[in-house]
């Protein structure tokens, strides 16, 4: 388990309680995952916090139930922009930000239509193949920024496929919460001409 301060743990507990309440009304996580909320979702998202320097801006793509965006805002204290097209999920994200005292801005638009200020870091979890994530991330990322994408067992295959379309610096960091999963860190990426 990732070590966090008592205050941060309390804020994460508030988030978990709120998510359980809202999940009864709107589908934020699958009902079978509620029992595994901490290891499956919160801990999985928390492992990114150690890779994020203090004070860096973050944009989370397809924020849904707040993973990893809200968790990172709580754990790091960094400002996080959450992009989510589902209005009901946006209402949840705003309430979670308020209840958990997290520095979040919620943009209720499709990723392609959103135009937040460029971020230092782009994150996403369980959203789309790497190729698509890079396409969405490129215009939203600062020149010297990087991306952190939580991926499952197909991480290496997605990286191989994306390498045909993108020049990039990358590394694969084994997931601490999913034996077959990985974090793909990407920087300096541009389309192959």
Curated annotation (Swiss-Prot):
Pfam families: GidB. The keyword Transit peptide does not apply. Its EC number is 2.1.1.170. It is found in: Cytoplasm. GO terms for molecular function: rRNA (guanine-N7-)-methyltransferase activity. S-adenosyl-L-methionine binds at residues 62, 67, 111-112, 125. Gene3D superfamilies: Vaccinia Virus protein VP39 (3.40.50.150). It comes from the Bacteria. Signal peptide: none annotated. Its main location: cytoplasm. NCBIfam families: rsmG_gidB. This is Ribosomal RNA small subunit methyltransferase G. It comes from Gluconobacter oxydans (strain 621H). The gene is rsmG.
């Amino acid at each position: 388990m990732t070590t966090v301060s008592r205050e941060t743990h309390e804020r994460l507990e508030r988030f978990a309680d709120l998510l359980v309440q809202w999940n009864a009304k709107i589908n934020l996580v699958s009902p079978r995952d509620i029992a595994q909320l901490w290891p499956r979702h919160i801990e999985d998202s928390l492992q990114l916090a150690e890779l994020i320097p203090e004070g860096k801006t973050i944009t989370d793509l397809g924020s849904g139930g707040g993973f990893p965006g809200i968790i990172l805002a709580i754990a790091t204290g960094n400002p996080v922009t959450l992009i989510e097209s589902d209005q009901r999920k946006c209402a949840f994200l705003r309430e979670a930000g308020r209840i958990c005292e997290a520095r979040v801005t919620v943009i209720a638009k499709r990723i392609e239509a959103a135009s937040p200020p460029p971020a230092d870091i782009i994150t996403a979890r369980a959203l789309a193949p790497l190729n698509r994530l890079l396409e969405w991330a490129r215009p939203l990322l600062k020149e010297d920024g990087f991306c952190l994408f939580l991926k499952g067992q197909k991480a290496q295959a997605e990286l191989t496929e994306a390498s045909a379309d993108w020049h990039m610096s990358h590394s694969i960091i084994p997931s601490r919460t999913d034996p077959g999963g990985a974090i793909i860190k990407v920087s300096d990426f541009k389309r192959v001409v």
